[in-house]
From Swiss-Prot:
<dbReference type="Pfam" id="PF22042">
    <property type="entry name" value="EF-G_D2"/>
</dbReference>
<dbReference type="GO" id="GO:0003924">
    <property type="term" value="F:GTPase activity"/>
</dbReference>
<dbReference type="InterPro" id="IPR041732">
    <property type="entry name" value="RF3_GTP-bd"/>
</dbReference>
<dbReference type="InterPro" id="IPR035647">
    <property type="entry name" value="EFG_III/V"/>
</dbReference>
<feature type="domain" description="tr-type G">
    <location>
        <begin position="8"/>
        <end position="277"/>
    </location>
</feature>
<dbReference type="InterPro" id="IPR038467">
    <property type="entry name" value="RF3_dom_3_sf"/>
</dbReference>
<dbReference type="GO" id="GO:0097216">
    <property type="term" value="F:guanosine tetraphosphate binding"/>
</dbReference>
<dbReference type="GO" id="GO:0006449">
    <property type="term" value="P:regulation of translational termination"/>
</dbReference>
<dbReference type="InterPro" id="IPR000795">
    <property type="entry name" value="T_Tr_GTP-bd_dom"/>
</dbReference>
<feature type="binding site">
    <location>
        <begin position="139"/>
        <end position="142"/>
    </location>
    <ligand>
        <name>GTP</name>
    </ligand>
</feature>
<dbReference type="InterPro" id="IPR027417">
    <property type="entry name" value="P-loop_NTPase"/>
</dbReference>
<dbReference type="InterPro" id="IPR009000">
    <property type="entry name" value="Transl_B-barrel_sf"/>
</dbReference>
<dbReference type="Pfam" id="PF00009">
    <property type="entry name" value="GTP_EFTU"/>
</dbReference>
<protein>
    <recommendedName>
        <fullName>Peptide chain release factor 3</fullName>
    </recommendedName>
</protein>
<keyword id="KW-0648">Protein biosynthesis</keyword>
<dbReference type="GO" id="GO:0005829">
    <property type="term" value="C:cytosol"/>
</dbReference>
<dbReference type="InterPro" id="IPR032090">
    <property type="entry name" value="RF3_C"/>
</dbReference>
Length: 526
């Protein structure tokens, strides 16, 4: 197959949702339809031995939430689909944000009983920054749901995106009979397929077919016809250009748990979602059709293999083709490296990649030299932009139970900070280690990973820090004066960047007024 054909058949997407809207179940069912796993293990919390394929870290297994981002690749409809699983738990916005910089489209999953929830709103704001095309799946139709028209109205008014229903539900809860495909004029009748059973779906042609009345009952058939008249009068028709621009979302209805409707949005994804898209660098735009290799690292994950203390850098291939043993330039450090053992992923199962094309995600073994945001090319000096680091909102001091393990603690924290799991600050005035996070759960993750991966018993406690800002100044003399007078509020982060840590917001505001020449940054590029 030629290079353009390989690139054009790739679809790279992520699933975004509020916690518990069914994202992990959908992830599994997508893999099931892509024949990537044989049995979809229902995700359980503590104590269950059936863990979802994409939740592999110890703490995730205990809590039944996907904390880290995994990558899964599977074939579907002559396409090769890369699914990036993002953490659904409300605490993990940074990792999720960075993952969304590596995809070309997203599937938004909504719990049809609850509608649009707060976490979905946040994630949609992120996709808005790059106008990412969005498909929508209204999930849990095997339960009692809100009125479907109401759900569409809510998506339109709250998320500011037009909805184009592709399928429409017939009943819900115990009376759920299936969905009607508006463009194809076909009804797909629901039969629950549990676990890994994909039922043969019976299809009824035509909305006026008496077979439809016989299958779902006169009342529901008539209700469907009435609702569709309303829908066709009130909602938008699918418009591909508006979808690609992130202005309109095709909407599908179904139940992931019942293995129903998942294939409908997969058909939509492979047919309509964009092929690998261009990406901005500091010098030019890189198109996916270019045959020279380039890619950027959007995530680093430690210990994917419990047997080895390894770290894997996840790289999105932007252009060209990766081949085993090829020489690439690691732009930030200006070194050429030979990559002979890149990985491809089926979550938890890693296999060595012989080749990968634009749109694919590959894993590079990392012994501490690769950082989030790093660019790799075949020689060209450029840096992909738009992968941010956020100033944390929550802070804790980390304390050792055994003071002799200070060295291991520091090593563990620096590695976790390079991975983007947490940010570490070392105050200039004392030996404290302060960690900053975007969500509370991250502190638990850090303590649990320090224990399992670095054999360090640590606890965290409150610390008098309200917020942090990275500080820079063009005038060296003024910067020195600022540093001298504010030493008690200054710290170095994991990458040795100078940071102002403020005990209160008032303190920060005063410092900014007092030193107008100093730049205080809330985010910085990786």
């Amino acid at each position: 197959m030629s290079y353009p054909q390989e690139v054009n058949k790739r679809r790279t997407f992520a699933i975004i949702s509020h916690p518990d809207a069914g994202k992990t179940t959908i992830t599994e069912k997508v893999l099931l339809y892509g024949n990537a796993i044989q049995t979809a293990g229902s995700v359980k919390g503590k104590g269950s031995s059936a863990h979802a394929k994409s939740d592999w870290m110890e703490m995730e297994k205990q809590r039944g939430i996907s904390i880290t981002t995994s990558v899964m690749q599977f074939p579907y409809n002559n396409c090769l689909v890369n699914l990036l699983d993002t953490p659904g738990h409300e605490d993990f916005s940074e990792d999720t944000y960075r993952t969304l910089t590596a995809v070309d489209s997203c599937l938004m999953v909504i719990d049809s009983a609850k509608g649009v929830e707060e976490r979905t709103i946040k994630l949609m704001e992120v996709t808005r920054l790059r106008d990412t095309p969005i498909l929508t799946f209204m999930n849990k139709l095997d339960r009692d749901i809100r009125d479907p028209m109401e759900l569409l109205d809510e998506v339109e008014s709250v998320l500011k995106i037009r909805c184009a229903p592709i399928t429409w539900p017939i009943g819900c809860g115990k009376l759920f009979k299936g969905v009607y495909h508006i463009a194809k004029d076909e009804t797909y009748l629901y039969q629950s397929g549990q676990g890994s059973t994909i039922q043969e779906v019976r299809i009824v042609k035509g909305l006026s077919s008496p077979e439809l009345d016989a299958a779902v009952g006169d009342d529901l058939a008539n209700q469907l016809r009435e609702e569709l008249e309303l829908v066709q009068g009130a909602s938008n028709e699918f418009d591909h250009e508006a979808f690609i621009n992130g202005e309109l979302t095709p909407v599908f209805f179904g139940t992931a748990l019942g293995n129903f409707g998942v294939d409908h949005f997969l058909d939509g994804l492979t047919e309509w979602a964009p092929k690998p898209q261009a990406r901005q660098t500091d010098v030019r735009t890189v198109e996916s059709s270019e045959e020279k290799f380039s890619g950027f690292v959007f995530k680093i994950q430690a210990n994917m293999d419990p047997k080895h203390r390894d770290r894997v850098a996840f790289m999105r291939v932007v252009s060209g083709k990766y081949e085993k043993g090829m020489k690439l330039k690691h732009v930030r450090i200006g070194k050429d490296v030979v990559i002979s053992d890149a990985l491809t992923f089926m979550a938890g199962d890693r296999s060595h990649a012989e080749e990968a094309y634009a749109g694919d995600i590959i894993g590079l073994h990392n012994h501490g030299t690769i950082q989030i945001g790093d660019t790799f090319t075949q020689g060209e000096v450029m840096k992909f932009t738009g992968i941010p680091n956020f100033a944390p909102e929550l802070f804790r001091r980390i304390r050792l139970k055994d003071p002799l393990k200070q060295k291991q603690l520091l090593k563990g924290l620096v590695q976790l900070s390079e991975e983007g799991a947490v940010q570490v600050f070392r105050p200039l005035m004392n030996n404290d280690l302060i960690v900053g996070a975007v969500g509370v759960l991250q502190f638990d993750v850090v303590v649990s990973r320090l224990k399992t991966e670095y054999n360090v018993e640590a606890i965290y406690e409150a610390v008098n820090v309200a917020t942090a800002r990275w500080v820079e100044c063009c005038d060296a003399k003024k910067f020195e004066e600022f540093k001298r007078k504010n030493e008690q509020n200054l710290a170095l982060d994991g990458g040795d960047n100078l940071t102002y840590i403020a005990p209160t917001m008032v303190n920060l505001n005063l410092a900014q007024e007092r030193y107008p020449d100093i730049n205080f940054f809330k985010t910085r590029e990786h």
